[in-house]
Each structure stands twice: as C-alpha cells, then as structure tokens.
Amino acid sequence: MPRYKLTIEYDGGPFCGWQYQTNGPSVQGALEAAVKAICGDDVRVHGAGRTDAGVHALAQVAHCDIARHFMPDRLRDGLNAHLRPHPIGVLEAEIVPDSFEARFSARRRHYIYRIANRRANLAIDVGRVWRVPRPLDTEAMHAAAQRLLGKHDFTTFRDTECQAKSPEKTLDQLDVIRNGDNVSIITSARSYLHSQVRSMVGSLVWVGHGRWNADDLSGALAARRREACGPVAPPDGLYLARVDYEGSIPLRQDR
C-alpha cells in the first residue's frame, strides 16, 4: 500500500482547526472526505502540525496510505477537484517510504505571524493578519525576542489545556522584521507547546508598545506561570510556513 506525502495550504478561518472535530469543519476532515471521494475508502490523513481554529498554512505536510496506486500529479489534481469550495489547496503529492511520518519525522517547523501595524482598517487581509493600530518598536521587540532562544521551560507561554508531557522546548529562531506597515514574526523550532507562538507574539507586542522591556519578558519566562504571560495574539495572523525533514534545504531569513 503506497504512502503519500501531501503539501497543503489553507485558509484556517472557516475551520475549527486541523484536527477532526465533531462540533465543526476541520481541515483534516475535508481532506479525508476528498480522499474517500477518489478511492472509496476511509483513509486517515496525518498532519505535521495540529493548527488551531483560524490558523493558516502555507505548506502544511500530511501523509496517508491509499490502497490504490495513483500517479502523484493525478492524486494532487483529484484532491483539489474534490476539495472545492473549501479554501484548501494541495500543492504537491509524492510517494514516500513507509517509514515517513508527517509529524514524527519532522526536524523543524517554521511559523510566521503577520501584523498590520497601521491605523487604517483592513480591507484585503481581514482574517489573515492582526491589525495593531498603535506604533510598534520592532527593534525592541526583536532584541527582547532573543531572550527566548534556546532550551527553556515555556510554561508561561503554554495554554492551560496543553497536553504535552513536558513544558521544555528549544526555540531556534525568533525574529521580528518590519517592512513598512507590515511586521513579520518568524520562528523556528522542532516542536511547540499549545498556543506557544501566539503567546510569545502577544507578549512581544507589549514590548513593542513599551509596556514591557526585555527584562520583563525574561522575567515572564522565568516565572513559569501562565498568569505571567502577556496577551495571546489572535489566530488570524499565524501561518504554518514550512516543515523541514531530513534532507530539506535550510530556510534562510535575512533581517
């Protein structure tokens, strides 16, 4: 039975998240319905990242085992046809070894959080960025963000319902980049805690507004208490940008 790796983009706005839910539509559910429409079987689609409700993906990765053999391009095109009108696109399909696991084979996950730092209302990017009308000091944000790099206990930035066994994670990258009114917060790690990225972003916005400084952010991290966290950024601006596996070309971001 061949195993297929799928690279997927989606607008998370209409979904209750990646993972199948009984109380609303999910990205996983839509993909599994599309696979069933093609092959007639119930097939589980396993994702590399279980994005929350409203969170988007530029290149989510998933795998599934299908009894029938498909040429990768035909599988991709068939899935896209059956996914309409959902805002989901299968960018690529490829046959991979049975040992490949979208989640457990991943070496690094890259997320981008987009902020529109402007007074004007959003017209085009509603639901796809976080509009922050007050000016942000992005240099201060970037400098403070470096305090979070490395291996730490991220309990402060962990949702109270997070089911991870350990609060320790290793953060490889956390950059804040401004391009006009557009601010991007780029982060990379092997894995994250539930709501970790949005919690870090919200706290960095407090730094950008001058409510916190870098020492305050370090103190929040050291407190290891959820109550010490700043606000949690909304899901609108968060994107799963890429998932790296063995042999992936490193993703470079120049400030």
Swiss-Prot record:
Formation of pseudouridine at positions 38, 39 and 40 in the anticodon stem and loop of transfer RNAs. One of its GO terms (biological process) is tRNA pseudouridine synthesis. It catalyses: uridine(38/39/40) in tRNA = pseudouridine(38/39/40) in tRNA. The keyword Chaperone does not apply. Coiled coil: none annotated. Belongs to the tRNA pseudouridine synthase TruA family. It comes from the Bacteria. This is tRNA pseudouridine synthase A. The active site is at D52 (nucleophile). Its EC number is 5.4.99.12. Keywords: Isomerase, tRNA processing. The lineage of its organism: Bacteria, Pseudomonadati, Pseudomonadota, Alphaproteobacteria, Hyphomicrobiales. Pfam families: PseudoU_synth_1. Homodimer. GO terms for molecular function: RNA binding; tRNA pseudouridine(38-40) synthase activity. Gene3D superfamilies: Pseudouridine synthase I, catalytic domain, C-terminal subdomain (3.30.70.660), Pseudouridine synthase I, catalytic domain, N-terminal subdomain (3.30.70.580). Substrate binds at Y111. It is an enzyme of class 5 (isomerase).
